[in-house]
């Protein structure tokens, strides 16, 4: 226990691990080998729902738990940018970093695959977060999301300060920045 909080062990299950009658929180498995188990989370509250993918690739289990969610928070890795970084690291002889850039492409989802999953799951809004590499300028953001809007147009590329509000008893999704 720290600062009055008690750690609990969470096991993925069809049933919520927390349910107070209003808020239900469900943990589910995602694919992030070599790290296993890895979890995603679904929060259901008074008719609204948010899903956090955690680090993962496209999977049927994530698709199942994202079904009809108001908002899907999806981590994303730009395969294009990362593969360029990998080649740059190789060209300067930094084999360690080049290997990392190569390996991470196997256990993170691309923005386009995230968009495909959101569309198939009938998600209302997709928020890309935990971005690799984080696009720090608008041109990089355009490269990061290239082709996404052709698959799923209702998305946000989050940064520090992105604020998402789902008013209860509503279908509205409010996206703003607190910066």
Residue spans of the language-model regions?
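Core dinuclear metal-dependent hydrolase active-site scaffold
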Residues: 2-67, 163-179
């Amino acid at each position: 226990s720290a600062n009055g909080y008690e750690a609990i062990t969470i096991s993925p299950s069809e049933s919520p691990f927390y349910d107070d009658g209003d808020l239900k929180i469900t943990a589910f498995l995602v694919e992030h080998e070599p790290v296993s188990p890895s979890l995603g989370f679904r929060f259901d509250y008074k008719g609204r729902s948010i899903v956090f993918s955690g680090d993962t690739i496209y999977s049927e289990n994530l698709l199942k738990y994202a079904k009809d969610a108001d908002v899907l928070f999806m981590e994303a890795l730009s395969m294009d940018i990362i593969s360029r970084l990998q080649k740059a690291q190789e060209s300067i002889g930094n084999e360690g970093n080049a290997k990392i850039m190569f390996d991470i492409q196997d256990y993170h989802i691309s923005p386009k695959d995230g968009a495909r999953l959101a569309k198939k799951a009938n998600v209302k809004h997709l928020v890309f977060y935990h971005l690799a590499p984080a696009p720090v300028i608008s041109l990089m953001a355009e490269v990061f999301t290239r082709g996404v809007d052709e698959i799923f147009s209702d998305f946000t590329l989050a940064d520090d300060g992105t604020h998402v509000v789902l008013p209860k008893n509503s279908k509205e999704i409010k996206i703003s920045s607190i910066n």
